[in-house]
């Protein structure tokens, strides 16, 4: 069985790591490189960096820090933010990233997924999906341009349809960002994860809602996700990654230690 992955997520804006709640009201956490180094040292399996306003600003990810991160960590890392072309992706890989993640640009141009997968291999292409649960209708909708709350918009894609579509086009992994849970720290949305898991044949990463160690356990054991991504519990040192892995191992979850 493949080991489950623990993945700290670093949202980047103006060259600094920030964190919001439900994708709003972002506060500054600190500098990118020291945080990345700390997480690698603590035992993270992978890091994900989102340049959160790149797509809504109509630009590509700020590459100045990608190379600096590659110099200080020896674990895989993934970079996202406004990647719209093969050339954009090529630059990020050249600076040392192991994977790229696309989200809003894939919604604008779904064929981008296939072009990137054909060029770099499916294993290097992650699709991020920002889902919002609409309580009145009981439906899960895919949102776009979520890095800037004034420009966030709901698309016409329902979640499960988009999950199927991106796999068809060559997504090698899916990160499901559950916006209702984001930064609230009351647990991942297991109902949503199970629905997605049923139609998702590629690695699935849960994102949004981790507040306690048991939340990671539940995502792995109950929803059978491949990785769990979290931000505020790591940034605010509520959970130590090494201790989390010891706890998960005791609970019967296969983790790298």
Curated annotation (Swiss-Prot):
GO terms for molecular function: imidazoleglycerol-phosphate synthase activity; lyase activity. GO terms for cellular component: cytoplasm. The keyword Lyase applies. It is an enzyme of class 4 (lyase). It comes from the Bacteria. Its main location: cytoplasm. NCBIfam families: hisF. PANTHER family: IMIDAZOLE GLYCEROL PHOSPHATE SYNTHASE HISHF, IMIDAZOLE GLYCEROL PHOSPHATE SYNTHASE SUBUNIT HISF/H IGP SYNTHASE SUBUNIT HISF/H. Heterodimer of HisH and HisF. This is Imidazole glycerol phosphate synthase subunit HisF. It comes from Mannheimia succiniciproducens (strain KCTC 0769BP / MBEL55E). The lineage of its organism: Bacteria, Pseudomonadati, Pseudomonadota, Gammaproteobacteria, Pasteurellales.
């Amino acid at each position: 069985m493949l080991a489950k992955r623990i993945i700290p997520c670093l949202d980047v804006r103006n060259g600094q790591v920030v964190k919001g709640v439900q994708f709003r009201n972002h506060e500054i956490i600190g500098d990118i490189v020291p945080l990345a180094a700390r997480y690698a040292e603590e035992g993270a399996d992978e890091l994900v960096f989102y340049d959160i306003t790149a797509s809504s600003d109509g630009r590509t990810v700020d590459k100045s820090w990608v190379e600096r991160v590659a110099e200080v960590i020896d674990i895989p890392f993934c970079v996202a933010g406004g990647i719209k072309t093969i050339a954009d992706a090529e630059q990020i890989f050249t600076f040392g990233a192991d994977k790229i993640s696309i989200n809003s640009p894939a919604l604008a141009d779904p064929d981008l997924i296939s072009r990137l997968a054909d060029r770099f291999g499916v294993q290097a292409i992650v699709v991020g999906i920002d889902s919002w649960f609409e309580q009145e209708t009981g439906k899960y909708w895919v949102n776009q341009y979520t890095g800037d709350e004034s420009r966030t918009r709901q698309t016409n894609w329902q979640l499960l349809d988009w999950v199927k579509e991106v796999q068809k086009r060559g997504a090698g992994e899916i990160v499901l960002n559950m916006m209702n849970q984001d930064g609230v720290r009351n647990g991942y949305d297991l109902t949503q994860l199970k629905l997605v898991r049923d139609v998702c044949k590629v690695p699935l990463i849960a994102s949004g809602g981790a507040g306690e160690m048991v939340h990671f356990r539940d995502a792995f054991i109950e929803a059978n996700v491949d990785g769990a991504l979290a931000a505020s519990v790591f940034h605010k040192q509520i959970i130590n990654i090494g201790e989390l892995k010891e706890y998960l191992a005791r609970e019967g979850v296969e983790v790298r230690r």
